[in-house]
Amino acid sequence: MSPAPPPCGFAEAESTNTKSAPKFRSACNACHEVKLKCLGGQPCARCRNKQVECVYSHAARIGKPKGSRNKKTLERLRQAKAMSRPEETQGEETTSLTAVDASQAINCRALSGSTRRDSSPLPPPHSDTDSAEGGAEEELLDQEERDEAEKPPLVENPPNLNPLEQISPPREDFLDLLAHSSLLNNTQHDLQHPTADMVPDGLAGFPHASTSAADDLSWMTSPTKSLLSTTFPAIEDDLQDLQDPFLCSSWRSACLPPSSSRSSFHFPRFNHFAEDTMGLEYASGMDATRSLGDPPHAMARAGSFSTSGPGSSQEGSHFLSSRHSQSSGMYQPVPKRPSCSCLKLQASALCRIHLVDRSHADMRGDTVLATASTILDSCNALILCPSCATDYKFLLLAIMTVRILLCWLRGLSATRTQNDNANMKLTLGEYEISGEEEAIIKNMLVSRALEKVKIAVRRLRERVNSITIQEVGNCSESTQRWDLTYIRMCLDHMEKQVGC
């Protein structure tokens, strides 16, 4: 027989004890410290093998205890309660209406409903079911009317706003303006005056400057005048001034281009201002383009400018002189360094050496002598140039070319090939030089070229010795010192070769 189950009360007490009892770790302390899997048991296999005490500690609870809240959560709940309290009080104030207001609203609704029922046609006959449904609908309608009566009444016209009828323009003036559409219809005027495309759309119907003063206001009708005077009160004085023929012609010429010049507008009201300050015009578009150079050149072209108006020549000259005196302190010509072709000569010499070195396997005497003449000429030009002789870049290029030339001349004087002797024929007029005389002349030419190289190396040494270390541009003193040391090493090596 199976044992009898424990009493109900004892089972509940045992379950509560098991729930509240702390749990132990699945691994013992020794295995947990070394992070190894514990097989369990008391003691476990690892503790039994090492003869270590096997102890199981309570499992640490992860996270916060139940029921605890963060400070931010409590603050957020407090703010939510504080925000909900004024809304509740405001809702209570809006919903609490007096009995008198509610009764008045219900009476108004009832009167309006009775008038609607009296004015509406009689409904068709209906059955009992229809009457029952109608009663339910009436109850719903009454409930809706009571709900609407409880709402505060809406203000139809706020006190600070005008009705729509006061804002909209009067219909008579608008139709009158549309009736006189001659202002917009300018087809005939376009045929007579082709320059009407340059005028804005609102001025397309204005008369041209060539018309007489008698029909100055013929284009403006009385409804248009009245509409302009009511809409813009300040323009009424201008309309009165337009009756004067002189003022009307001036205003017309200010709005439209004159017949004599179709390419630019003319403003007679600003003639005095234009003559005093900006009355100068360019004689042609090319002068305007060329005058954008340096200020002295632009001022030298003052004779090509043309002026218009009485006394404009004196005022224009005074304007030019004042502008030139003001700009003389602001714009100063920047002094330019003297231009030279040293860099171009050095680069050409280096390219020539490169081409000769690639095109000839065995250097011929005539080719070496011709190349030597070009290289030595560029080197002498660099030494004599006052602005480039102290630049390390140019000196390095010159030393590079002279070193290559020196190697060619030494090789040409040391070895003589059969191909060289066969191709190099020396003649003096009709006399052909050969044998010992030919060798003497060739040695003399090579020695003369070596002497020129020796002179060039000596001049380069003098130029390098005169250079002082100083900061120039973005080049540091250490970089200049290193370049100067390398240049001196190359010159020492070449001096040993030529025997300086």
UniProtKB/Swiss-Prot annotation:
Transcription factor that regulates sirodesmin production and contributes to virulence. Probably binds to the consensus motif TCGGN(3)CCGA found in the promoters of sirT, sirP, sirO, sirN, sirP, sirB, sirR, sirJ and sirQ. InterPro entries: Stress_Response_Reg, Zn2-C6_fun-type_DNA-bd_sf, Zn2Cys6_DnaBD. Residues 135-147 have a biased composition (Acidic residues). Disruption phenotype: Leads to reduced production of sirodesmin PL and decreased transcription of sirodesmin PL biosynthetic genes. It comes from the Eukaryota. CDD domains: GAL4. Residues 79-168, 302-332 are annotated as: Disordered. This is C6 finger domain transcription factor sirZ. GO terms for cellular component: nucleus. The lineage of its organism: Eukaryota, Fungi, Dikarya, Ascomycota, Pezizomycotina. Residues 28-54 bind DNA. It comes from Leptosphaeria maculans (Blackleg fungus). Pfam families: Zn_clus (PF00172). Induction: Expressed during canola infection. Expression is co-regulated with the other genes from the sirodesmin cluster and corresponds with sirodesmin production. One of its GO terms (molecular function) is DNA-binding transcription factor activity, RNA polymerase II-specific.
